């Protein structure tokens, strides 16, 4: 920028202040110096005494200088606050005029930490979102400029090389993803009670961090939070924590001991992997799952202690692998599953205690441990036979000489592909045969298992010459594929009683597929003893063998002259996709039905279930599109997941009192299910249980306390819901897109969950009950409300909670503490009646303020409609719409008076107004002109609606028309009233 000799200098341009608090501008040619003027927003100018020849309000310096530090400088000492900066260029030679002032630059000076604070949540809170010149010790204040600091943004301090110590303010609840990651000098962080969320990688690679105390309000330490914190010596985890996430403390090299609190349920994948000096782990009583590689390669780990009364159920794959100094482990009672390679490579383990509750030990769980040092070819972990370490795997016969008495179980894959093994006789102590324990043993022809209770998945699969098996008399479970491909297996040559014991309760899918049993099928049904285990048409396109009717109650099978038998059980997926099957009679003897037993039997119209049936398992009748009726047994205990999913013609269900649980999706997409009766045993309706059903009405009895996510969602005919008592939780979108017109919520309910009634377009009346404190996001989005009456106990209204409702009036109580952004989005015909300004906490956010006028000081009845309001000059000034404008003063809000709608009342019509409370006759009616003294209280007068009122569609166009301000009487106002319907509008000028 320049000026000709004798001219006027150009004004400085490009004025700005960067993150380092350095003021810069573009140099002006021929300028001899510059004047910098800094003032506060109220016009008070700062005083600078550095240059005596300049004004005390300005600072001049050489033209070569086009920057000046605003902080850490003796020239300017600025406190935190807002300032206006402008700069003038001074002429160098005589005849050269000084420039005009530059355009004003608004500048906000941060705290000396250099943190950048940004308004969020509609201007009610602050977030720290970047670091600025932060160095050394940082204190994030509780409040900033009078408002709480509640969040630290994602990556706010990421990569800062100067910060050493951070104290987080007491109002902060959220610490963002990677907020402090890669801060190499950060040694100390103090987190307050009240923090609820710590983001992923929040402190990752803080290599100098020595100690951390996680507040009790934090429920989860997520992915990578403290990974690669090489100096982290002490971690305090408080009660309240529930989940330690994947890689949360991985690759630490200083942490020697960790105590997991009792409230933690899950320790995530790789959570403490490669903790190089970790020596001791104390596992709390609440931990249920230790996931894959959680403590893997913690090479100094010597001790793992489980709390008494532990809840541990599962150790997943490689959970403690390569912990080379771990000498022993005592697993607590209740543990059920030890995953593959769980202790793989733990070379010092010499002893382990496995409780009888364990029902599965995965392949290689104890490979390369100290247990291998014991003599003999067979490796034992406590009472489990876990490995056969022969290189040649040439065992021929397994019996008591090979498997020691007292052995409880055989782990997964121990004898897989033993090429010479011909016969197996298990000791009477063995109760479990693991997954694929003897798979593909080509010479195995005989198995005797006198006391085995569980034969696991694929245990003897593809043993091609296995002919007979003695199952003993206590067997309860044969899992899927257990004998699949044993092409010569034919136990049906024995009497049915000798084929399978009566103790069997479950047979998995395809457990006997491709055995000789398929060649002895009766009417297309494959039996093993008294169990129907499949059909001859499985996997075939040809349906010529299909049947139209099967009687399993009286089904008789000729077993080569033996006595005839009846069916007692149906295996998992036994009749899957039998399209031609129409009826089944199973009333007498079938006590067990397997998972997915009749999956997608599209022509099945009904089934009579035995009174002895106790459980209907997952997917049992899923996709039986022709099923019209089902009578549930009087002693039924449970209905599994998706048990009747998409039974499109099923009309009604009566759930007996004996039933205590219903699985998720149990009756999902039963589009013609119009009637359901709940018994006294049900306490919870699970997620999606009746989603997309044909229900018209439903009564929720007193014994039910929880209604799950989308439980009745998208049921297009559901119009009436009666909740009789004690529901404490209604899940996300539980009634979304239904045809509800009204509902009474119980006093026991404290929160209306997000999207609970989303898109229920006919819903116009809700009795909120006395307990509701919070209304979630989108809770009533797109409903049919005309008058929204928020009850006095509600404290919080979520985003878009009442958006798209076309409401004409909104009444708000003083109990409200926060109204989220756009809570009433698109309700642009409404007027808001608020008991006080306190009722509008957080109101000026988004559509709430931009489009809706407000009247303060309204009197609202317990039912939520407006009883009266005061006509006064003060009130006149407070009837407005907030409009965002941009002018010379920048972007700001202005108020304009607008035509507003009078309050509504469900089922009644406005008859006019009276100055006496409780009046039955209106004093002012259509066409009246009247004067109203300042402070007059007008009371609405209501009457019953009649047919001519058309209350659902007709609304008052104008009630107060032209509030006459031509009168200069300070004590009165004049209005003309026009009444025409249920709601009204008036214009105040």
Q: How would you label these PLM feature ranges?
A:
Residues 154-156, 176-179, 199-202, 222-225, ...:
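Consensus positions within tandem repeat domains that build extended binding/scaffold surfaces
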Residues 38-78:
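Recognizes extended acidic, P/S/T-rich segments that occur
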Residues 523-524, 631, 722, 856-949, ...:
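Secondary-structure capping and domain/repeat boundary segments
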Residues 93-109:
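Extracellular fibronectin type III
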Residues 21-30, 913:
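Conserved aromatic anchor
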Residues 116-121, 133-151, 161-174, 184-197, ...:
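Structural signature of tandem-repeat unit edges
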């Amino acid at each position: 920028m320049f000026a000709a000799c004798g001219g006027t200098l150009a004004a400085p341009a490009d004025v700005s202040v960067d993150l380092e608090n350095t003021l810069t501008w573009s140099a002006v040619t021929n300028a001899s110096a510059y004047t910098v003027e800094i003032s506060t927003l109220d016009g008070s100018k700062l005083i600078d005494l550095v240059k005596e020849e300049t004004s005390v309000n300005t600072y001049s310096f050489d033209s070569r200088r086009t920057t000046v530090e605003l902080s850490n400088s003796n020239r300017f000492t600025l406190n935190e606050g807002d300032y206006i900066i402008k700069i003038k260029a001074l002429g160098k030679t005589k005849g050269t005029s000084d420039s005009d002032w530059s355009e004003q630059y608004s500048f906000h000076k941060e705290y000396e930490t250099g943190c950048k604070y940004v308004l969020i949540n509609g201007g009610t809170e602050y977030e720290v979102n970047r670091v600025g010149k932060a160095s050394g010790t940082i204190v994030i204040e509780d409040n900033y400029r009078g408002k709480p600091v509640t969040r630290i943004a994602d990556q706010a301090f990421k990569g800062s090389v100067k910060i050493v110590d951070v104290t987080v303010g007491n109002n902060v609840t959220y610490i963002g993803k990677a907020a402090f990651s890669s801060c190499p000098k950060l040694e100390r962080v103090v987190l307050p009670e009240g923090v609820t969320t710590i983001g992923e990688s929040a402190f990752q690679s803080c290599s100098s961090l020595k100690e951390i105390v996680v507040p009790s309000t934090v429920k989860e330490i997520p992915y990578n939070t403290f990974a690669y914190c090489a100096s982290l010596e002490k971690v305090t985890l408080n009660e309240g924590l529930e989940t330690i996430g994947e890689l949360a403390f991985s690759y630490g090299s200083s942490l020697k001991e960790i105590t997991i609190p009792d409230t933690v349920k899950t320790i995530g994948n790789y959570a403490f992997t490669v903790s190089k000096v970790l020596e001791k782990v104390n596992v709390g009583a609440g931990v249920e799952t230790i996931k894959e590689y959680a403590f893997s390669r913690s090479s100094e780990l010597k001790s793992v202690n489980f709390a008494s009364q532990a809840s541990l159920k599962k150790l997943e794959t490689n959970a403690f692998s390569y912990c080379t100094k771990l000498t022993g482990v005592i697993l607590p009672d209740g543990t059920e599953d030890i995953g593959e390679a769980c202790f793989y490579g733990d070379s010092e383990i010499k002893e382990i205690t496995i409780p009888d509750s364990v029902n599965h030990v995965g392949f290689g769980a104890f490979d390369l441990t100290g247990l291998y040092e014991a003599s003999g070819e067979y490796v034992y972990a406590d009472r489990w036979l876990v490995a056969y370490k022969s290189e040649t795997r040439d065992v021929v016969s397994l019996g008591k000489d090979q498997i020691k008495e007292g052995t409880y179980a055989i782990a997964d894959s121990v004898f897989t592909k033993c090429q010479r093994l011909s016969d197996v006789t298990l000791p009477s102590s063995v109760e479990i045969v693991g997954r694929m324990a003897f798979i593909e043993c080509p010479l195995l022809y005989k198995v005797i298992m006198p006391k085995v209770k569980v034969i696991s998945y694929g245990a003897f699969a593809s043993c091609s010459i296995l002919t007979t098996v003695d199952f003993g008399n206590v067997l309860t479970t044969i899992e899927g594929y257990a004998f699949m491909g044993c092409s010569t297996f034919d136990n049906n040559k024995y009497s049915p009683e000798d084929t399978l014991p009566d103790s069997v309760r479950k047979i998995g899918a395809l457990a006997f597929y491709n055995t000789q049993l398929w060649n002895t099928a009766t009417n297309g049904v494959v039996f093993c003893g008294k169990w129907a285990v499949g059909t001859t048409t499985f996997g075939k396109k040809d349906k010529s063998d299909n049947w139209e009717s099967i009687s399993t109650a009286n089904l008789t099978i000729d077993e080569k002259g033996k006595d005839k038998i009846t069916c007692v059980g149906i295996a998992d997926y036994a009749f899957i996709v039998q399209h031609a099957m129409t009826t089944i009679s199973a009333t007498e003897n079938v006590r067990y039905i397997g998972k997915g037993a009749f999956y997608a039997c599209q022509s099945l119209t009904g089934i009579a279930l035995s009174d002895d049936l106790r459980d209907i398992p997952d997917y049992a009748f899923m996709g039986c599109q022709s099923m019209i009726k089902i009578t549930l047994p009087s002693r039924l205990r449970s209905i599994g997941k998706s048990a009747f999913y998409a039974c499109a013609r099923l009309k009604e269900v009566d759930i007996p009192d004996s039933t205590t649980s219903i699985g998720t999706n149990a009756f999902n997409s039963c589009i013609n299910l119009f009637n359901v009766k709940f018994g006294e045993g049900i306490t919870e309706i699970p997620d999606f249980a009746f989603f997309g059903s044909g229900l018209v009405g439903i009564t929720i009895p007193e014994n039910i306390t929880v209604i799950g996510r989308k439980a009745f969602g998208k049921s297009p005919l559901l119009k009436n819901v009666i909740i009789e008592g004690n529901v404490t939780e209604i899940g996300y979108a539980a009634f979304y897109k239904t045809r509800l017109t009204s509902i009474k919520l119980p006093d026991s309910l404290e929160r209306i969950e997000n999207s609970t009634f989303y898109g229920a377009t006919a819903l116009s009346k809700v009795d909120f009950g006395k307990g509701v404190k919070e209304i979630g996001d989108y809770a009533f989005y797109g409903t049919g409300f005309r008058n929204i009456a928020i009850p006095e106990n509600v404290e919080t209204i979520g985003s878009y909670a009442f958006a798209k409702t076309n409401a004409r009036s909104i009444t708000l109580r003083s109990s409200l503490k926060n109204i989220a952004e756009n809570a009433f989005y698109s309700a642009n015909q409404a007027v808001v009646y608020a008991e006080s300004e306190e009722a509008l906490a957080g109101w000026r956010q988004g559509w709430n303020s931009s489009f809706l006028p407000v009247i303060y000081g309204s009197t609202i009845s317990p039912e939520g409609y407006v009883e009266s309001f005061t006509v006064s000059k003060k009130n006149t000034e407070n009837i407005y719409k907030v409009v965002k404008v941009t002018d010379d003063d920048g972007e700001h809000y202005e108020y304009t008076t607008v035509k507003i709608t009078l309050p509504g009342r469900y089922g009644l019509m406005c008859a006019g107004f009276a100055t006496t409370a409780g009046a039955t006759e209106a004093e002012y009616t259509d066409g009246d002109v009247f004067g109203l003294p300042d402070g007059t209280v007008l009371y609405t007068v209501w009457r019953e609606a009649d047919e001519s009122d058309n209350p659902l569609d007709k609304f008052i166009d104008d009630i107060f028309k032209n509030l006459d301000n031509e009168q200069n009487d300070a004590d009165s106002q004049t209005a003309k009233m026009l009444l025409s319907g249920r709601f009204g509008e008036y214009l105040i000028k």
